[in-house]
Amino acid sequence: MKKIDVKILDQRIGTEFPLPTYATEGSAGLDLRALIDAPMTVEAGQTVLIPTGLSLYIADPTLAAVILPRSGLGHKHGIVLGNLVGLIDSDYQGPLMVSLWNRSTEPFKVEVGDRIAQLVFVPVVQAEFNVVSDFAQTERGEGGFGHSGKQ
């Protein structure tokens, strides 16, 4: 299994806050925590940037990382990512921030250390483009947006 070196900027991680871990052997994502100095309220409709205390430099161009919402926050509280998915390229070297959007009608309180998103590493395939006059025919052809049926 490939390992990636993740640098931790916030000295509270590992002392006041646990190191990020995978919850189970089959977990794809690591939980990202709100490393804020005091609790904060995200008002209805508001989007805020929240530091995670982590910095990341993947370096390997065959890998990237994505920041994804936590399903329970979105379903139960209307808390999702302001950019829907955060993409971390292999050559990015900065701190990880989470854009948190309260799409509900109620204020939402973020406590210091709350788990607010998850980080997943993914393989990268870069496309090479070739201009052609047509494609080989398939059974589906150009059909889209429900063309293959409902059931």
Curated annotation (Swiss-Prot):
Keywords: Hydrolase, Magnesium, Metal-binding, Nucleotide metabolism. It catalyses: dUTP + H2O = dUMP + diphosphate + H(+). Transmembrane segments: none annotated. Pfam families: dUTPase. Pathway: Pyrimidine metabolism; dUMP biosynthesis; dUMP from dCTP (dUTP route): step 2/2. It is an enzyme of class 3 (hydrolase). This enzyme is involved in nucleotide metabolism: it produces dUMP, the immediate precursor of thymidine nucleotides and it decreases the intracellular concentration of dUTP so that uracil cannot be incorporated into DNA. This is Deoxyuridine 5'-triphosphate nucleotidohydrolase.
